[in-house]
Amino acid sequence: MRDARISPDGKEIVFCYKGDIYKVPVQGGTATQLTTQASYEANPVWSPDGKQIAFASDRNGNFDLFIMSADGGTARRLTYHSASEIPSAFTPDGKFVLFSASIQDPAQSALFPTGAMTELYKVPVTGGRTEQVLATPAEWVCFDKSGKNFLYQDRKGFEDEWRKHHTSSITRDVWLYDASTGKHTNLTNREGEDRNPVYAPDGNSVYFLSERNGGSFNVYNFTLNTPQEVKAITTFRTHPVRFLSISDKGTLCYTYDGELYTQEPNARPKKVNVDLVRDDEKEIATLRFSQGATSASVSPDGKQVAFIVRGDVFVTSTDYATTKQITNTPAKESGVSFAPDN
């Protein structure tokens, strides 16, 4: 599960699973599938009133913006450009959807003349002409309640966004943009990843994801008056926290190790147990072989044997009657061997 967003009223969460959009109550339970296309749907965002969801879909080739009822139904296409468009947020009045796309750099800006460096645009929810908001990359936009300012994460280079423990001059920072003056303020100016900012309900503090303190991505917080004074909200260690969002009442929502979590102010994280029902899951097949292995390798400790049957790699235990399929690809695997560390 990925691309999780909690609804403004804090009662539901939308997320992406296997290329479709789902919705589940914050208490957990059976998720409702909102899209059923053969295409890939992702990056859902809620309208301020919680009645609509905008998302990206590649059903026409590249990713375009679509909008639909939060209860499901027919999706309506909003953008038609050949570039891929990824939504960030609705404007607070609900009239526009902001999105990132590499459409056209203005003549006065030659800083990012490449498809990998997007610009920020908005499109009316009723459809129509798009309008450029910023000529520089601005991702994960989050407006304050007035609509005059918004937070965003920048992008300075081509580094993989999923890379962990990245430290350099091109790591992402959290910025504040004042639309009335056009001023950009860097709130987390350091050589480390800071991203995915969201306003707290009071509008005076910010939650964001960071790898500071030498660990994995976790949720942190600072006030706008003292952004240098950062407080850790979560302390996960093994895997990174991703896809941070917040409700109007301050309930945080994010993913950890592919699972959904919520967190109330001054409380511990709570896992959201989700039941997913799909009609395209493969039936479990039991395969039995007594011959036909094309190659085999014994692990350095002698406790496992890897072998290839029907073009896929399997591993079996010498101590237990357990065999596990390791690969499942259209290609034929060959030359199996164990690494020195087992």
Write out the residue ranges for each language-model feature:
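Signature of short aromatic-glycine-proline-rich micro-motifs recurring in repeat-based ectodomains
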Residues: M1-D3, A138, R288-S297
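A flexible loop/linker signature enriched in serine peptidases of the S9 family
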Residues: C16-Y22, T36-E41, P48, A54-F66, ...
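Structural signature of eukaryotic scaffold interfaces centered on beta-propeller domains
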Residues: S7, D144, A200, S245-I246, ...
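Mature N-terminal segment immediately following signal peptide/propeptide cleavage
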Residues: M1-V26, S297
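Long, contiguous interaction/recruitment modules in multidomain scaffold/adaptor proteins
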Residues: K271-V272
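Glycine/alanine-rich phosphate-binding loops at beta-alpha junctions
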Residues: A31
